[in-house]
């Protein structure tokens, strides 16, 4: 079973440019544009008593949109999990064809909700393969109405940091993610997705400093 380590936070849109400068300096790679249509599907009663949820992700930034299916399992629990500052959970992910949505509907899944995430991402190697995405999360007034999407939280953007892991190395991966997040702390507080921490009081001052000196150093 594949696993992933995850932390999440929020940042005011006015400070996103400063965060991008910081990430560019830390990661040492070019940013990638992010435009993903996410469909959350839930299983119907014909597929068992326990409801199952899968996410279909359509990457709209490709010349030909590509599709991925992702199933997020339960989070790791127990004393060990409580001592780790990141969420460690089971996860299965696979590339699929554009017919995947039709297939899930045929299996009895129903569309629960859909989102459009627009922003940018950095992918780099630092002990683990870490991905950082900064995006505006938008909802649609009508099914699949991407062009009419409106922000869920105007003026705020979501920051996600994820890294794939296994049952053998999740401790090292979690430590790498935690260490990386410390560099972002002046601008955004990152924690387990279930824990809401709000914006960072020092963000405005940190952003002003970054904008004036043009970024940091590569790790």
UniProtKB/Swiss-Prot annotation:
Keyword Isomerase: no
Keywords annotated in UniProt: Abscisic acid signaling pathway, Developmental protein, Ethylene signaling pathway, Nucleus, Plant defense, Transcription, Transcription regulation, Transcription termination
Origin superkingdom: Eukaryota
Localization annotation: Nucleus
GO-annotated molecular function: transcription coregulator activity
Deletion phenotype: Deregulated expression of glutaredoxins GRX480, GRXS13 and thioredoxin TRX-h5 leading to enhanced susceptibility to fungal infection (e.g. B.cinerea and A.brassicicola). Altered RNA polymerase II occupancy and histone H3 lysine tri-methylation (H3K36me3) of target genes. Insensitivity to abscisic acid (ABA) and to the ethylene precursor 1-aminocyclopropane-1-carboxylic acid (ACC). Delayed flowering.
One Pfam family cited in the UniProt record for this chain: Med18
Location (main, coarse): nucleus
Example GO biological process: defense response
InterPro entries: Mediator_Med18
GO cellular component: mediator complex; nucleus
Role of this protein: Component of the Mediator complex, a coactivator involved in the regulated transcription of nearly all RNA polymerase II-dependent genes. Mediator functions as a bridge to convey information from gene-specific regulatory proteins to the basal RNA polymerase II transcription machinery. The Mediator complex, having a compact conformation in its free form, is recruited to promoters by direct interactions with regulatory proteins and serves for the assembly of a functional pre-initiation complex with RNA polymerase II and the general transcription factors.
Summary of subunit composition and partner proteins: Component of the Mediator complex. Interacts with YY1 to suppress disease susceptibility via the repression of genes glutaredoxins GRX480, GRXS13 and thioredoxin TRX-h5. Binds to ABI4 to regulate abscisic acid responses; recruited by ABI4 to ABI5 promoter in the presence of abscisic acid (ABA). Interacts with SUF4 to regulate flowering time; recruited by SUF4 to FLC promoter.
Family under the similarity heading: Belongs to the Mediator complex subunit 18 family.
PANTHER family, alphabetized: MEDIATOR OF RNA POLYMERASE II TRANSCRIPTION SUBUNIT 18 (PTHR13321:SF2), MEDIATOR OF RNA POLYMERASE II TRANSCRIPTION, SUBUNIT 18 (PTHR13321)
Stated name of the protein: Mediator of RNA polymerase II transcription subunit 18
Organism: Arabidopsis thaliana
Gene name of the record: MED18
């Amino acid at each position: 079973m594949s696993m992933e380590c995850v932390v999440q936070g929020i940042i005011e849109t006015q400070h996103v440019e400063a965060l991008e400068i910081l990430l560019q300096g830390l990661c040492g790679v070019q940013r990638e544009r992010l435009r993903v249509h996410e469909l959350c599907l839930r299983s119907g009663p014909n597929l068992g008593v326990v409801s199952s949820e899968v996410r279909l992700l359509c990457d709209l930034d490709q010349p030909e949109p590509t599709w991925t299916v992702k199933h997020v399992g339960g989070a790791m629990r127990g004393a060990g999990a409580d001592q780790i500052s990141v969420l460690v959970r089971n996860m299965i992910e696979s590339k699929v064809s554009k017919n995947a949505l039709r297939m899930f509907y045929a299996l009895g899944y129903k569309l629960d909700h859909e989102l459009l995430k627009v922003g940018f991402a950095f992918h780099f190697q630092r002990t683990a393969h870490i991905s950082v995405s900064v995006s505006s999360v938008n909802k649609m007034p009508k099914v699949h109405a991407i062009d009419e999407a409106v922000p869920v939280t105007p003026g705020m953007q979501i920051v996600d940091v994820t890294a794939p892991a296994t049952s053998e190395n999740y401790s090292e991966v979690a430590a790498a993610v935690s260490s990386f997040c410390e560099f972002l702390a002046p601008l955004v507080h990152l924690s387990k997705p279930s824990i809401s921490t709000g914006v960072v009081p020092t963000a405005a001052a940190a952003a002003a400093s970054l904008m004036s000196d043009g970024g940091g150093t590569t790790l």
